[in-house]
């Protein structure tokens, strides 16, 4: 098995050529996203011909934060038997591929079921609507992309929220935190006999404000050394579990038709958003929240 992190042709790299070379030797390939649909079709066909596997890895759905956001979205639905009534994704051009993958997995949606429309062409964020048979979601997409340094200059990498009347589930960043915030709703709050200081606390007042499912690492170095490799190990373990299964028996996200449809949705989203503004974000001053500013005299 070869893991390829060299960029694919659509972002100016030779990753797909490397993938082809390995597949031609009968070596299965896991290739880093994004990959153009035409390349995926070609490489999937080659993998089938050579009796091996070709999989695109979007990484972020497989790290701890992504997995817990996906898992708890599905747990909430199972408990209350209701789809989210609202949602929002904020991300950048470089990371929209993985954001769409996280969303589809959490909602158990096939990418073919999603349509994309442009609501407002703004700067620095554009507003698009992702529609599916169960509802709509607002996508806030960064308009700038640095062609010379695409992996940097994201105003937001991943910020994803799904909301229900009972509260909302947040993936605050690519590596967390993942939190559930309870909605404020107190029964009989207009009854003075049941006011907070007139009677024992109600069940609603005893509820915690939020529940934390995952706290992110302390530093970007911890992410690079631990969290990202763990995400890749997780995906490889999932692949190993279904290595001998026919494609239609594998988990949906590892099936060729899902992987191709996700890339097609990615292209459709970028086409709807229109051409990015090529450039970098101005240098910024890093925040230091641990340094004491002292008291005023």
Model-predicted regions and their roles:
Residues 17, 65-73, 99, 231-240:
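Well-ordered, non-membrane alpha-helical segments in soluble/globular domains
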Residues 84-168, 173-179, 186-188, 287-294:
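Rossmann-like dinucleotide-binding domain that binds NAD(P)(H)
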Residues 1-6, 225-297:
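C-terminal helix-rich "cap/oligomerization" subdomain common to oxidoreductases
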Residues 7-9, 59, 144-145:
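Short glycine-rich anion-binding loops that position phosphate/pyrophosphate groups of nucleotides
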Residues 1-48:
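Beta-loop-alpha module in the N-terminal Rossmann-like domain of NAD(P)-dependent dehydrogenases
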Residues 27, 52-53, 135:
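Short, well-ordered coil/turn segments that N-cap beta-strands
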Residues 171-253, 279:
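C-terminal glycine/acidic-rich active-site capping loop/insertion
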Residues 36-105:
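A contiguous active-site-proximal alpha/beta segment in oxidoreductase catalytic domains
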